[in-house]
């Protein structure tokens, strides 16, 4: 995202995903690519183009990795172009696109200074646009229905009851129609206590690490670094060999350049 100015080169992305998995396997971390991403890379290796390699990818991989695009690209049509380019290689289905559009829009809204309530509304609007992209796929209407319910439902649900809500209404599996609404439910329920919301999401079962990653992206965008304790940041940076502040600054520079060109 940083190297390309917000618009991802799909073949470069494919190569970097494959290289990353090789590095993880070499470090003893096992196979970490999701099923949709793996099938897409196999399709590319077999000669299929990026417009068709992800036509069965309906899981949450695109939504999970889309936050940097939301940071780098301001709200508007250009954001949707960037999200589609970042997603279709592996997740070119309506349900996966809707999920990725939702998370990216929520993050972009938050980075622009908006709060959590506005981020959820931005996510709903973007998901409806994303649902028109990619191959029509089962679960799309269910994802939209669950997202539309969130503002009204969460107004009646206490933070202590959000786990029950997620288990009963959204689910937490790797399919987009469960994990994306679950992530946004945790983010909205947490309010200003981003750390509590993130810990609840990470304890939800199912694909909870991905749910927490998406929730954390939205919370961080809307609340800033103060949402999470410094020791948590330090642990993530140490374990992953990354300086999150530098990455954030570089993504912010991309966003500023794009805003200057509008």
Q: How does the language model describe each region?
A:
Residues 1-262:
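Structured, active/binding-site neighborhoods that engage oxygen-rich ligands
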